[in-house]
Protein backbone atom coordinates (compact mmCIF):
# COMPACT_ATOMS: atom_id res chain seq x y z
CA UNK A 1 0.00 0.00 0.00
CA UNK A 2 2.86 2.39 0.83
CA UNK A 3 4.28 1.78 -2.67
CA UNK A 4 0.92 2.73 -4.15
CA UNK A 5 0.90 5.94 -2.10
CA UNK A 6 4.40 6.87 -3.28
CA UNK A 7 3.30 6.47 -6.87
CA UNK A 8 0.30 8.64 -6.11
CA UNK A 9 2.53 11.38 -4.73
CA UNK A 10 4.42 11.48 -8.01
CA UNK A 11 1.30 11.49 -10.15
CA UNK A 12 -1.14 13.57 -8.16
CA UNK A 13 0.63 16.11 -5.99
CA UNK A 14 -0.88 18.90 -8.07
CA UNK A 15 -3.98 17.41 -9.70
CA UNK A 16 -5.13 20.78 -11.03
CA UNK A 17 -1.84 21.86 -12.53
CA UNK A 18 -2.37 21.58 -16.26
CA UNK A 19 -6.03 20.61 -15.86
CA UNK A 20 -8.62 22.85 -17.45
CA UNK A 21 -12.26 23.71 -17.04
CA UNK A 22 -14.70 25.89 -18.96
CA UNK A 23 -16.11 28.58 -16.67
CA UNK A 24 -18.08 31.76 -17.28
CA UNK A 25 -14.80 33.69 -17.48
CA UNK A 26 -13.50 31.35 -20.19
CA UNK A 27 -11.32 28.27 -20.45
CA UNK A 28 -9.21 28.12 -17.28
CA UNK A 29 -5.98 26.12 -17.33
CA UNK A 30 -5.36 25.85 -13.59
CA UNK A 31 -7.75 26.43 -10.72
CA UNK A 32 -8.48 25.58 -7.12
CA UNK A 33 -11.80 24.39 -5.72
CA UNK A 34 -12.70 26.24 -2.53
CA UNK A 35 -15.69 26.22 -0.21
CA UNK A 36 -16.10 29.78 1.13
CA UNK A 37 -17.33 29.73 4.72
CA UNK A 38 -19.30 32.70 5.98
CA UNK A 39 -17.85 33.75 9.33
CA UNK A 40 -20.17 36.62 10.21
CA UNK A 41 -23.77 36.61 11.32
CA UNK A 42 -26.51 39.19 11.75
CA UNK A 43 -26.62 40.36 15.41
CA UNK A 44 -29.64 39.40 17.46
CA UNK A 45 -32.43 41.92 17.08
CA UNK A 46 -31.03 43.32 13.83
CA UNK A 47 -33.28 43.64 10.79
CA UNK A 48 -32.54 40.75 8.44
CA UNK A 49 -31.71 41.93 4.94
CA UNK A 50 -31.49 39.56 2.04
CA UNK A 51 -27.92 40.79 1.53
CA UNK A 52 -26.14 42.07 4.62
CA UNK A 53 -24.26 45.37 4.68
CA UNK A 54 -21.03 43.63 5.70
CA UNK A 55 -19.89 40.02 5.38
CA UNK A 56 -16.76 37.95 5.81
CA UNK A 57 -15.84 34.73 4.04
CA UNK A 58 -13.02 32.36 4.82
CA UNK A 59 -11.39 30.04 2.30
CA UNK A 60 -7.94 28.97 1.20
CA UNK A 61 -5.80 30.18 -1.68
CA UNK A 62 -2.69 28.19 -2.56
CA UNK A 63 -3.28 26.19 0.61
CA UNK A 64 -3.21 29.25 2.87
CA UNK A 65 -6.30 30.62 4.67
CA UNK A 66 -7.60 34.03 3.64
CA UNK A 67 -10.44 36.10 5.05
CA UNK A 68 -12.37 38.17 2.52
CA UNK A 69 -14.02 41.26 4.06
CA UNK A 70 -16.96 42.61 2.05
CA UNK A 71 -19.01 45.79 2.37
CA UNK A 72 -22.07 46.51 0.27
CA UNK A 73 -21.50 49.28 -2.28
CA UNK A 74 -24.32 51.58 -1.22
CA UNK A 75 -23.34 54.15 -3.84
CA UNK A 76 -23.63 51.83 -6.83
CA UNK A 77 -27.09 53.01 -7.91
CA UNK A 78 -28.56 56.49 -7.94
CA UNK A 79 -31.65 57.15 -5.83
CA UNK A 80 -33.67 57.41 -9.03
CA UNK A 81 -32.23 54.47 -10.91
CA UNK A 82 -34.45 53.28 -13.76
CA UNK A 83 -34.40 50.74 -16.58
CA UNK A 84 -35.86 50.74 -20.06
CA UNK A 85 -36.47 47.73 -22.23
CA UNK A 86 -38.84 46.97 -25.06
CA UNK A 87 -41.80 44.61 -25.33
CA UNK A 88 -42.05 42.08 -28.21
CA UNK A 89 -44.25 44.53 -30.13
CA UNK A 90 -41.67 47.31 -29.72
CA UNK A 91 -43.30 49.31 -26.91
CA UNK A 92 -40.91 51.10 -24.58
CA UNK A 93 -41.21 50.00 -20.95
CA UNK A 94 -39.47 51.95 -18.17
CA UNK A 95 -39.45 50.75 -14.57
CA UNK A 96 -37.91 51.87 -11.28
CA UNK A 97 -36.84 48.63 -9.60
CA UNK A 98 -35.89 48.61 -5.94
CA UNK A 99 -32.11 48.29 -5.80
CA UNK A 100 -31.40 49.22 -2.18
CA UNK A 101 -30.94 45.62 -1.01
CA UNK A 102 -28.61 44.58 -3.83
CA UNK A 103 -25.77 42.05 -3.79
CA UNK A 104 -22.70 43.94 -5.04
CA UNK A 105 -19.76 44.48 -2.72
CA UNK A 106 -16.32 45.99 -2.43
CA UNK A 107 -13.78 44.45 -0.12
CA UNK A 108 -10.28 43.41 0.79
CA UNK A 109 -8.27 40.45 1.98
CA UNK A 110 -7.51 40.59 5.70
CA UNK A 111 -3.90 41.52 6.57
CA UNK A 112 -3.14 42.44 2.95
CA UNK A 113 -2.29 46.15 2.82
CA UNK A 114 -2.69 46.57 -0.96
CA UNK A 115 -5.63 44.23 -1.44
CA UNK A 116 -8.92 45.07 -3.16
CA UNK A 117 -11.99 43.06 -4.13
CA UNK A 118 -15.07 43.60 -6.28
CA UNK A 119 -17.58 40.83 -5.69
CA UNK A 120 -21.13 39.88 -6.63
CA UNK A 121 -22.74 37.79 -3.88
CA UNK A 122 -26.04 37.24 -5.71
CA UNK A 123 -25.60 33.50 -6.30
CA UNK A 124 -22.39 32.52 -4.63
CA UNK A 125 -19.29 34.71 -4.87
CA UNK A 126 -18.29 36.01 -8.30
CA UNK A 127 -15.72 38.66 -9.11
CA UNK A 128 -12.06 39.37 -8.49
CA UNK A 129 -9.65 40.18 -5.69
CA UNK A 130 -6.01 41.17 -5.34
CA UNK A 131 -3.76 39.02 -3.17
CA UNK A 132 0.00 39.49 -2.80
CA UNK A 133 0.10 41.58 -5.95
CA UNK A 134 -1.73 39.00 -8.10
CA UNK A 135 -5.22 39.23 -9.59
CA UNK A 136 -7.47 36.28 -8.75
CA UNK A 137 -10.94 35.52 -10.10
CA UNK A 138 -13.61 33.59 -8.21
CA UNK A 139 -16.89 32.11 -9.38
CA UNK A 140 -19.26 29.33 -8.30
CA UNK A 141 -18.92 25.86 -9.77
CA UNK A 142 -22.14 24.38 -11.09
CA UNK A 143 -22.00 21.18 -9.06
CA UNK A 144 -25.09 19.50 -7.56
CA UNK A 145 -25.63 20.09 -3.86
CA UNK A 146 -22.35 21.97 -3.45
CA UNK A 147 -21.00 25.33 -2.30
CA UNK A 148 -17.86 24.78 -4.37
CA UNK A 149 -16.21 27.75 -6.08
CA UNK A 150 -13.31 27.98 -8.51
CA UNK A 151 -10.45 30.36 -7.65
CA UNK A 152 -7.83 31.01 -10.29
CA UNK A 153 -5.26 33.56 -11.33
CA UNK A 154 -6.15 35.91 -14.16
CA UNK A 155 -3.13 34.64 -16.09
CA UNK A 156 -4.59 31.12 -16.12
CA UNK A 157 -7.56 32.13 -18.29
CA UNK A 158 -6.78 31.22 -21.89
CA UNK A 159 -6.43 34.25 -24.19
CA UNK A 160 -6.60 34.22 -27.95
CA UNK A 161 -3.27 34.63 -29.70
CA UNK A 162 -3.82 37.90 -31.49
CA UNK A 163 -2.63 41.49 -31.70
CA UNK A 164 -2.89 43.50 -28.46
CA UNK A 165 -6.25 45.21 -28.00
CA UNK A 166 -6.27 48.98 -27.68
CA UNK A 167 -8.34 52.13 -27.39
CA UNK A 168 -9.23 53.91 -30.64
CA UNK A 169 -8.69 57.44 -29.30
CA UNK A 170 -6.05 59.36 -31.26
CA UNK A 171 -7.01 62.97 -30.51
CA UNK A 172 -4.91 65.02 -28.09
CA UNK A 173 -6.41 66.67 -25.04
CA UNK A 174 -4.26 69.77 -24.75
CA UNK A 175 -2.81 72.21 -27.28
CA UNK A 176 0.64 72.10 -25.69
CA UNK A 177 2.74 69.46 -23.96
CA UNK A 178 2.93 71.43 -20.72
CA UNK A 179 0.35 69.36 -18.78
CA UNK A 180 2.15 66.18 -19.88
CA UNK A 181 5.51 67.47 -18.67
CA UNK A 182 4.04 68.57 -15.37
CA UNK A 183 2.21 65.29 -14.91
CA UNK A 184 5.28 63.20 -15.68
CA UNK A 185 7.20 65.07 -12.98
CA UNK A 186 4.38 64.69 -10.48
CA UNK A 187 5.10 62.77 -7.29
CA UNK A 188 1.59 62.20 -6.01
CA UNK A 189 1.28 62.57 -2.24
CA UNK A 190 -1.71 61.56 -0.14
CA UNK A 191 -2.62 65.24 0.18
CA UNK A 192 -2.50 65.82 -3.57
CA UNK A 193 -4.72 62.81 -4.19
CA UNK A 194 -7.57 64.46 -2.29
CA UNK A 195 -9.36 65.66 -5.38
CA UNK A 196 -12.63 67.53 -4.88
CA UNK A 197 -15.60 65.18 -4.68
CA UNK A 198 -17.33 64.76 -8.03
CA UNK A 199 -20.39 62.74 -9.04
CA UNK A 200 -20.83 61.10 -12.44
CA UNK A 201 -24.37 59.91 -13.14
CA UNK A 202 -23.78 57.12 -15.62
CA UNK A 203 -26.24 55.82 -18.21
CA UNK A 204 -25.48 52.52 -19.90
CA UNK A 205 -27.01 51.29 -23.12
CA UNK A 206 -26.64 47.64 -24.15
CA UNK A 207 -27.27 46.95 -27.82
CA UNK A 208 -29.14 44.02 -29.32
CA UNK A 209 -25.97 42.00 -29.84
CA UNK A 210 -25.25 42.28 -26.12
CA UNK A 211 -28.75 41.10 -25.26
CA UNK A 212 -28.50 38.17 -27.68
CA UNK A 213 -25.14 37.21 -26.18
CA UNK A 214 -26.01 37.44 -22.48
CA UNK A 215 -29.83 37.16 -22.33
CA UNK A 216 -31.08 37.10 -18.71
CA UNK A 217 -27.53 37.42 -17.39
CA UNK A 218 -27.02 40.83 -19.00
CA UNK A 219 -28.27 42.96 -16.10
CA UNK A 220 -26.15 41.31 -13.36
CA UNK A 221 -23.21 41.32 -15.77
CA UNK A 222 -23.58 45.10 -16.22
CA UNK A 223 -24.06 45.69 -12.49
CA UNK A 224 -20.92 43.70 -11.68
CA UNK A 225 -18.96 45.71 -14.24
CA UNK A 226 -20.16 49.09 -12.93
CA UNK A 227 -19.34 47.94 -9.39
CA UNK A 228 -15.72 47.51 -10.48
CA UNK A 229 -15.69 50.87 -12.31
CA UNK A 230 -17.02 52.53 -9.15
CA UNK A 231 -14.19 51.01 -7.13
CA UNK A 232 -11.54 52.10 -9.65
CA UNK A 233 -12.61 55.75 -9.45
CA UNK A 234 -12.60 55.92 -5.67
CA UNK A 235 -8.91 56.87 -5.78
CA UNK A 236 -9.87 59.96 -7.81
CA UNK A 237 -12.70 60.84 -5.40
CA UNK A 238 -15.17 60.41 -8.26
CA UNK A 239 -18.43 58.66 -7.42
CA UNK A 240 -19.74 56.65 -10.38
CA UNK A 241 -23.46 55.99 -9.85
CA UNK A 242 -25.57 54.01 -12.31
CA UNK A 243 -28.64 56.12 -13.00
CA UNK A 244 -30.07 54.36 -16.03
CA UNK A 245 -29.88 51.11 -18.00
CA UNK A 246 -31.37 50.76 -21.48
CA UNK A 247 -31.41 47.32 -23.08
CA UNK A 248 -32.18 47.10 -26.79
CA UNK A 249 -33.89 43.72 -26.62
CA UNK A 250 -35.75 43.80 -29.94
CA UNK A 251 -33.58 45.88 -32.26
CA UNK A 252 -30.93 48.57 -32.19
CA UNK A 253 -31.78 52.27 -32.06
CA UNK A 254 -28.66 53.10 -34.06
CA UNK A 255 -26.92 51.08 -36.75
CA UNK A 256 -23.59 50.27 -35.16
CA UNK A 257 -20.66 50.11 -37.57
CA UNK A 258 -17.37 48.26 -37.37
CA UNK A 259 -15.72 51.68 -37.73
CA UNK A 260 -15.57 52.77 -34.08
CA UNK A 261 -15.48 56.51 -34.88
CA UNK A 262 -18.73 56.20 -36.87
CA UNK A 263 -20.46 54.25 -34.10
CA UNK A 264 -19.33 56.79 -31.49
CA UNK A 265 -20.78 59.67 -33.54
CA UNK A 266 -24.07 57.82 -34.15
CA UNK A 267 -24.40 57.06 -30.45
CA UNK A 268 -23.62 60.68 -29.55
CA UNK A 269 -26.36 61.93 -31.87
CA UNK A 270 -28.88 59.47 -30.39
CA UNK A 271 -27.89 60.44 -26.86
CA UNK A 272 -28.39 64.15 -27.60
CA UNK A 273 -31.71 63.82 -29.43
CA UNK A 274 -33.33 60.93 -27.54
CA UNK A 275 -31.63 59.78 -24.35
CA UNK A 276 -31.10 63.17 -22.68
CA UNK A 277 -34.79 63.95 -23.16
CA UNK A 278 -35.68 60.72 -21.39
CA UNK A 279 -33.33 60.73 -18.41
CA UNK A 280 -30.90 63.27 -17.01
CA UNK A 281 -27.37 61.90 -16.73
CA UNK A 282 -23.78 63.07 -17.11
CA UNK A 283 -22.22 60.45 -19.35
CA UNK A 284 -23.50 57.58 -21.49
CA UNK A 285 -21.60 54.43 -22.46
CA UNK A 286 -22.67 52.01 -25.19
CA UNK A 287 -21.92 48.33 -24.63
CA UNK A 288 -21.79 46.44 -27.90
CA UNK A 289 -20.78 43.00 -29.08
CA UNK A 290 -19.89 44.24 -32.56
CA UNK A 291 -16.29 43.61 -33.63
CA UNK A 292 -14.62 46.95 -34.31
CA UNK A 293 -12.06 47.26 -37.08
CA UNK A 294 -8.48 46.39 -36.17
CA UNK A 295 -7.45 46.01 -32.53
CA UNK A 296 -9.86 48.72 -31.29
CA UNK A 297 -12.06 47.72 -28.34
CA UNK A 298 -13.23 51.15 -27.16
CA UNK A 299 -13.43 54.82 -28.00
CA UNK A 300 -14.54 58.06 -26.39
CA UNK A 301 -14.36 61.83 -26.77
CA UNK A 302 -11.70 63.53 -24.65
CA UNK A 303 -12.61 66.28 -22.13
CA UNK A 304 -16.26 65.92 -23.03
CA UNK A 305 -18.21 65.22 -19.83
CA UNK A 306 -21.35 67.41 -19.59
CA UNK A 307 -21.40 67.98 -23.38
CA UNK A 308 -24.81 66.90 -24.78
CA UNK A 309 -23.37 64.98 -27.74
CA UNK A 310 -19.77 64.19 -26.85
CA UNK A 311 -20.08 62.93 -23.26
CA UNK A 312 -20.14 59.36 -24.55
CA UNK A 313 -18.02 56.27 -24.92
CA UNK A 314 -18.33 52.88 -26.60
CA UNK A 315 -17.03 49.56 -25.24
CA UNK A 316 -16.70 46.31 -27.18
CA UNK A 317 -17.52 43.18 -25.18
CA UNK A 318 -14.61 41.21 -26.64
CA UNK A 319 -13.93 38.97 -23.62
CA UNK A 320 -15.99 37.06 -21.06
CA UNK A 321 -13.81 38.34 -18.20
CA UNK A 322 -15.98 40.98 -16.54
CA UNK A 323 -13.02 42.80 -14.98
CA UNK A 324 -11.46 43.48 -18.39
CA UNK A 325 -14.66 45.09 -19.67
CA UNK A 326 -14.84 47.20 -16.50
CA UNK A 327 -11.29 48.47 -17.03
CA UNK A 328 -12.06 49.33 -20.66
CA UNK A 329 -15.10 51.33 -19.55
CA UNK A 330 -13.07 53.06 -16.83
CA UNK A 331 -10.49 53.93 -19.51
CA UNK A 332 -13.06 55.46 -21.87
CA UNK A 333 -14.69 57.34 -18.99
CA UNK A 334 -11.22 58.65 -18.17
CA UNK A 335 -11.10 60.23 -21.63
CA UNK A 336 -14.45 61.91 -20.93
CA UNK A 337 -12.88 63.32 -17.75
CA UNK A 338 -9.92 64.85 -19.56
CA UNK A 339 -7.31 62.09 -19.43
CA UNK A 340 -5.05 61.32 -22.38
CA UNK A 341 -3.23 58.06 -22.95
CA UNK A 342 -0.22 57.44 -20.74
CA UNK A 343 3.06 58.14 -22.51
CA UNK A 344 6.58 56.89 -21.88
CA UNK A 345 7.16 59.77 -19.48
CA UNK A 346 4.45 58.61 -17.07
CA UNK A 347 5.26 56.77 -13.85
CA UNK A 348 3.25 53.68 -14.79
CA UNK A 349 3.75 51.69 -17.97
CA UNK A 350 0.62 49.58 -17.48
CA UNK A 351 -1.97 51.79 -15.80
CA UNK A 352 -5.63 52.31 -16.74
CA UNK A 353 -4.96 54.99 -19.35
CA UNK A 354 -2.40 52.93 -21.25
CA UNK A 355 -3.44 52.85 -24.91
CA UNK A 356 -3.05 49.05 -24.93
CA UNK A 357 -5.03 46.80 -22.61
CA UNK A 358 -2.67 45.00 -20.27
CA UNK A 359 -2.73 41.44 -18.90
CA UNK A 360 -3.77 41.47 -16.18
CA UNK A 361 -5.60 44.79 -16.58
CA UNK A 362 -4.49 47.50 -14.17
CA UNK A 363 -6.91 49.24 -11.80
CA UNK A 364 -4.51 52.14 -11.06
CA UNK A 365 -4.29 55.64 -12.48
CA UNK A 366 -0.86 57.03 -13.28
CA UNK A 367 0.49 60.36 -12.08
CA UNK A 368 -0.11 61.64 -15.62
CA UNK A 369 -3.81 60.74 -15.42
CA UNK A 370 -4.13 62.52 -12.08
CA UNK A 371 -2.46 65.60 -13.55
CA UNK A 372 -4.69 65.58 -16.62
CA UNK A 373 -7.82 65.21 -14.50
CA UNK A 374 -6.85 68.03 -12.16
CA UNK A 375 -6.06 70.30 -15.11
CA UNK A 376 -9.39 69.38 -16.74
CA UNK A 377 -11.33 70.34 -13.61
CA UNK A 378 -9.54 73.69 -13.47
CA UNK A 379 -9.71 74.53 -17.19
CA UNK A 380 -13.22 73.29 -17.99
CA UNK A 381 -14.96 73.47 -14.60
CA UNK A 382 -17.60 70.89 -15.63
CA UNK A 383 -20.80 71.79 -13.81
CA UNK A 384 -22.86 68.63 -14.28
CA UNK A 385 -20.63 66.53 -11.99
CA UNK A 386 -20.61 68.95 -9.05
CA UNK A 387 -23.69 67.72 -7.23
CA UNK A 388 -24.99 64.39 -6.03
CA UNK A 389 -28.05 62.97 -7.73
CA UNK A 390 -31.34 64.40 -6.54
CA UNK A 391 -34.19 62.20 -5.35
CA UNK A 392 -36.09 62.57 -8.60
CA UNK A 393 -34.17 63.49 -11.72
CA UNK A 394 -36.84 63.22 -14.42
CA UNK A 395 -36.79 66.04 -16.93
CA UNK A 396 -40.31 66.08 -18.34
CA UNK A 397 -43.46 66.41 -16.17
CA UNK A 398 -45.33 63.14 -15.59
CA UNK A 399 -47.90 62.15 -18.19
CA UNK A 400 -50.31 59.35 -17.33
CA UNK A 401 -50.58 56.87 -20.17
CA UNK A 402 -47.09 57.21 -21.68
CA UNK A 403 -45.91 53.89 -20.17
CA UNK A 404 -43.19 55.67 -18.18
CA UNK A 405 -43.31 55.42 -14.40
CA UNK A 406 -42.87 59.04 -13.32
CA UNK A 407 -43.11 61.22 -10.21
CA UNK A 408 -46.44 60.75 -8.42
CA UNK A 409 -47.45 57.64 -10.37
CA UNK A 410 -47.79 54.17 -8.87
CA UNK A 411 -48.00 52.53 -12.28
CA UNK A 412 -48.35 53.47 -15.96
CA UNK A 413 -49.55 50.79 -18.35
CA UNK A 414 -50.46 53.03 -21.27
CA UNK A 415 -53.90 54.10 -22.41
CA UNK A 416 -57.02 52.37 -20.99
CA UNK A 417 -57.52 50.65 -24.36
CA UNK A 418 -53.99 49.22 -24.46
CA UNK A 419 -53.32 48.55 -20.77
CA UNK A 420 -52.48 44.90 -20.12
CA UNK A 421 -51.53 45.28 -16.44
CA UNK A 422 -54.47 44.32 -14.26
CA UNK A 423 -53.00 45.84 -11.07
CA UNK A 424 -53.03 49.33 -12.59
CA UNK A 425 -55.88 51.78 -13.08
CA UNK A 426 -54.90 53.15 -16.49
CA UNK A 427 -57.02 56.27 -16.02
CA UNK A 428 -55.35 57.45 -12.80
CA UNK A 429 -51.98 55.65 -13.02
CA UNK A 430 -52.63 54.42 -9.48
CA UNK A 431 -52.88 50.84 -8.28
CA UNK A 432 -56.39 49.51 -7.76
CA UNK A 433 -57.52 49.67 -4.13
CA UNK A 434 -57.68 45.87 -3.90
CA UNK A 435 -54.07 45.34 -4.98
CA UNK A 436 -51.95 43.62 -2.32
CA UNK A 437 -48.69 43.27 -4.25
CA UNK A 438 -47.12 43.70 -7.66
CA UNK A 439 -44.18 41.32 -7.62
CA UNK A 440 -42.47 38.70 -5.51
CA UNK A 441 -42.34 34.94 -5.17
CA UNK A 442 -45.63 34.99 -3.25
CA UNK A 443 -47.47 37.46 -5.48
CA UNK A 444 -49.88 36.29 -8.17
CA UNK A 445 -52.29 38.45 -10.14
CA UNK A 446 -51.74 41.36 -7.75
CA UNK A 447 -52.68 39.38 -4.63
CA UNK A 448 -50.75 37.36 -2.07
CA UNK A 449 -50.61 33.67 -2.89
CA UNK A 450 -52.54 31.41 -0.56
CA UNK A 451 -50.79 30.09 2.52
CA UNK A 452 -48.99 26.85 1.77
CA UNK A 453 -48.04 27.61 -1.83
CA UNK A 454 -44.40 26.59 -2.36
CA UNK A 455 -42.23 29.59 -3.17
CA UNK A 456 -38.78 28.02 -2.77
CA UNK A 457 -38.37 24.33 -3.45
CA UNK A 458 -35.94 22.27 -1.41
CA UNK A 459 -32.48 22.15 -3.03
CA UNK A 460 -31.63 18.88 -1.34
CA UNK A 461 -33.25 16.48 1.08
CA UNK A 462 -31.52 18.45 3.85
CA UNK A 463 -33.20 21.66 2.74
CA UNK A 464 -36.75 22.64 3.66
CA UNK A 465 -39.17 24.04 1.08
CA UNK A 466 -40.51 27.47 1.98
CA UNK A 467 -44.21 28.26 1.63
CA UNK A 468 -46.10 31.50 1.21
CA UNK A 469 -47.86 32.87 4.28
CA UNK A 470 -50.76 34.79 2.72
CA UNK A 471 -49.36 37.87 4.49
CA UNK A 472 -46.45 38.91 2.28
CA UNK A 473 -45.26 38.87 -1.33
CA UNK A 474 -41.82 37.72 -0.20
CA UNK A 475 -40.79 34.13 0.34
CA UNK A 476 -39.81 33.40 3.98
CA UNK A 477 -36.14 33.18 4.94
CA UNK A 478 -34.40 30.05 3.69
CA UNK A 479 -34.18 27.32 6.35
CA UNK A 480 -33.06 23.71 6.44
CA UNK A 481 -33.26 20.50 8.45
CA UNK A 482 -31.24 20.15 11.62
CA UNK A 483 -27.59 19.27 11.31
CA UNK A 484 -27.00 15.57 11.89
CA UNK A 485 -30.19 14.29 10.30
CA UNK A 486 -29.46 11.21 8.13
CA UNK A 487 -29.54 11.80 4.37
CA UNK A 488 -28.82 10.02 1.07
CA UNK A 489 -30.09 6.70 2.41
CA UNK A 490 -27.89 6.97 5.53
CA UNK A 491 -24.73 7.57 3.50
CA UNK A 492 -24.42 11.00 5.08
CA UNK A 493 -25.75 13.49 7.61
CA UNK A 494 -27.25 16.89 6.92
CA UNK A 495 -24.96 19.88 7.42
CA UNK A 496 -26.15 23.45 6.78
CA UNK A 497 -28.71 22.35 4.19
CA UNK A 498 -26.39 20.03 2.28
CA UNK A 499 -25.56 16.34 2.52
CA UNK A 500 -21.76 16.15 2.29
CA UNK A 501 -20.49 12.69 1.39
CA UNK A 502 -17.06 11.63 0.22
CA UNK A 503 -18.36 10.18 -3.04
CA UNK A 504 -19.62 13.56 -4.27
CA UNK A 505 -16.42 15.25 -3.14
CA UNK A 506 -14.43 12.77 -5.25
CA UNK A 507 -16.80 13.43 -8.14
CA UNK A 508 -16.10 17.15 -7.88
CA UNK A 509 -12.34 16.64 -7.76
CA UNK A 510 -11.77 13.88 -10.31
CA UNK A 511 -14.89 13.54 -12.45
CA UNK A 512 -17.82 11.14 -12.88
CA UNK A 513 -15.72 7.95 -12.84
CA UNK A 514 -14.28 8.72 -9.41
CA UNK A 515 -15.38 7.16 -6.13
CA UNK A 516 -14.06 6.91 -2.57
CA UNK A 517 -10.71 5.17 -2.09
CA UNK A 518 -10.30 2.01 -0.03
CA UNK A 519 -9.95 2.31 3.75
CA UNK A 520 -6.24 1.51 3.63
CA UNK A 521 -5.55 4.68 1.64
CA UNK A 522 -6.65 6.85 4.56
CA UNK A 523 -4.07 5.31 6.92
CA UNK A 524 -1.50 7.67 5.38
CA UNK A 525 -3.13 10.53 7.30
CA UNK A 526 -1.35 9.43 10.48
CA UNK A 527 1.98 10.64 9.06
CA UNK A 528 1.60 14.29 10.00
CA UNK A 529 3.58 15.65 7.03
CA UNK A 530 2.67 18.39 4.55
CA UNK A 531 0.63 15.95 2.46
CA UNK A 532 -1.17 13.81 5.02
CA UNK A 533 -2.42 15.31 8.27
CA UNK A 534 -5.54 16.38 10.13
CA UNK A 535 -4.71 19.89 11.36
CA UNK A 536 -2.05 22.53 11.08
CA UNK A 537 -1.15 24.35 14.29
CA UNK A 538 1.66 26.92 14.59
CA UNK A 539 3.08 25.85 11.22
CA UNK A 540 3.20 22.23 12.42
CA UNK A 541 1.27 19.42 10.74
CA UNK A 542 -0.69 17.36 13.27
CA UNK A 543 -1.16 13.68 12.33
CA UNK A 544 -4.60 12.15 12.50
CA UNK A 545 -5.38 9.78 15.32
CA UNK A 546 -6.33 6.37 13.96
CA UNK A 547 -10.02 7.03 14.58
CA UNK A 548 -9.79 10.38 12.71
CA UNK A 549 -7.96 9.33 9.52
CA UNK A 550 -11.11 9.80 7.43
CA UNK A 551 -11.24 13.47 8.42
CA UNK A 552 -7.84 14.35 6.95
CA UNK A 553 -6.80 14.07 3.31
CA UNK A 554 -9.54 12.68 1.07
CA UNK A 555 -8.58 9.64 -0.97
CA UNK A 556 -10.40 8.71 -4.14
CA UNK A 557 -10.08 6.05 -6.80
CA UNK A 558 -11.63 5.17 -10.13
CA UNK A 559 -14.33 2.57 -10.61
CA UNK A 560 -12.10 0.84 -13.18
CA UNK A 561 -8.99 0.79 -10.93
CA UNK A 562 -10.05 0.51 -7.30
CA UNK A 563 -6.50 -0.14 -6.06
CA UNK A 564 -5.41 3.40 -6.94
CA UNK A 565 -5.17 5.92 -4.06
CA UNK A 566 -5.77 9.29 -5.76
CA UNK A 567 -5.75 12.53 -3.81
CA UNK A 568 -5.70 16.29 -4.33
CA UNK A 569 -2.73 18.08 -2.77
CA UNK A 570 -4.52 21.42 -2.32
CA UNK A 571 -6.62 22.45 0.68
CA UNK A 572 -9.71 21.45 -1.28
CA UNK A 573 -8.54 17.84 -1.11
CA UNK A 574 -9.29 17.60 2.61
CA UNK A 575 -12.47 15.85 3.73
CA UNK A 576 -15.20 18.50 4.08
CA UNK A 577 -16.58 19.41 7.50
CA UNK A 578 -19.81 17.57 8.30
CA UNK A 579 -18.88 14.54 6.17
CA UNK A 580 -19.75 11.10 7.53
CA UNK A 581 -16.57 9.34 8.73
CA UNK A 582 -18.15 6.35 10.49
CA UNK A 583 -21.60 5.17 11.53
CA UNK A 584 -23.08 7.86 13.76
CA UNK A 585 -20.02 10.11 13.36
CA UNK A 586 -19.02 13.13 11.26
CA UNK A 587 -15.90 15.26 10.82
CA UNK A 588 -16.07 18.30 13.09
CA UNK A 589 -14.27 21.63 12.72
CA UNK A 590 -11.14 20.18 14.36
CA UNK A 591 -11.05 17.29 11.86
CA UNK A 592 -12.01 14.78 14.50
CA UNK A 593 -14.43 11.96 13.76
CA UNK A 594 -16.96 12.96 16.41
CA UNK A 595 -20.38 11.77 17.52
CA UNK A 596 -23.02 13.26 15.23
CA UNK A 597 -25.03 14.44 18.24
CA UNK A 598 -22.22 16.62 19.61
CA UNK A 599 -20.11 17.44 16.52
CA UNK A 600 -21.89 20.70 15.68
Swiss-Prot record:
UniProt xrefs under SUPFAM superfamilies: Blood coagulation inhibitor (disintegrin), Metalloproteases ('zincins'), catalytic domain
The protein's enzyme class: hydrolase
Family matches, as InterPro entries: ADAM_Cys-rich, Disintegrin_CS, Disintegrin_dom, Disintegrin_dom_sf, MetalloPept_cat_dom_sf, Peptidase_M12B, Peptidase_M12B_N, Reprolysin_adamalysin
Propeptide: 21-191
Glycosylation positions in this chain: 261, 317, 425, 467, 513
Residues annotated for Zn(2+) binding in this entry: 331, 335, 341
Location(s) in or outside the cell: Secreted
EC number, as in UniProt: 3.4.24.-
UniProt keyword RNA-binding, yes or no: no
UniProt record, GO biological process: proteolysis
Entry-annotated residues carrying Pyrrolidone carboxylic acid: 192
Signal sequence region: 1-20
Residues of the active site: 332
Sequence motif D/ECD-tripeptide, residues: 461-463
PANTHER family, sorted: ADAM A DISINTEGRIN AND METALLOPROTEASE DOMAIN, DISINTEGRIN AND METALLOPROTEINASE DOMAIN-CONTAINING PROTEIN 28
Entry's family note: Belongs to the venom metalloproteinase (M12B) family. P-III subfamily. P-IIIa sub-subfamily.
Assembly with partners or alone: Monomer.
Protein name: Zinc metalloproteinase-disintegrin-like stejnihagin-B
Protein source organism: Trimeresurus stejnegeri (Chinese green tree viper)
Amino acid sequence: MIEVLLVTICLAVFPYQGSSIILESGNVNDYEVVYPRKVTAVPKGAVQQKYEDAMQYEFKVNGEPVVLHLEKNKELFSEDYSETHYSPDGREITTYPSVEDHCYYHGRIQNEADSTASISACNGLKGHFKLQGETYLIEPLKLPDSEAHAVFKYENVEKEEEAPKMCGVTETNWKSDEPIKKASQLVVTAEQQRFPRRYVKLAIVADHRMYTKHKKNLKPWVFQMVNSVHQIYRSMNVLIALVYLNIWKKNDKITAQSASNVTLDLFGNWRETVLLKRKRHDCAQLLTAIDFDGPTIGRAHVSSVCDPKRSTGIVQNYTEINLVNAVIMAHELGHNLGMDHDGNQCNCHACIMSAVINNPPSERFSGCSMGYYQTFLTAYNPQCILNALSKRDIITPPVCGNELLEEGEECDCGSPENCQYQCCNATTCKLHSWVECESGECCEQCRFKKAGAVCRAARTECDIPENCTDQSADCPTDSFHRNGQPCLYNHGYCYNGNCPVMHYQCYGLFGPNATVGQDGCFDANDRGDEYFYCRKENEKYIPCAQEDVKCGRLFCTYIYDINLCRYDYSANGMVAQGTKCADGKVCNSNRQCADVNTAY
